[in-house]
Amino acid sequence: MLYSIRGLTMAHFAKIENDTVTQVIVVSNDDCGGGNFPDSEPIGQTFIASLGLTGEWLQTSYNANFRANYASIGYTYDADLDEFVPPPIIEPIDEP
């Protein structure tokens, strides 16, 4: 998803390590070819690599328009579903 801040259209990319999101960055739409997902993703990935940032970077949607959820640190990426999955909610244990 692309969104606008002060007239700048931005895209978000998540760094994936061992299927886990470890970082999320914002990239200018101009650096993603000016288009929409999925066309913008490989162009954005090339731009991210040109900055010297290594690893696997996947575009994520702030409004969850694709890949099911906005990627946040600690989420997992399910490649089979092509979705970002939130971590499980751990309920506190009531002690007697």
Task: List where the protein language model places each region.
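Viral virion structural and adsorption modules
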Residues: M1-P96
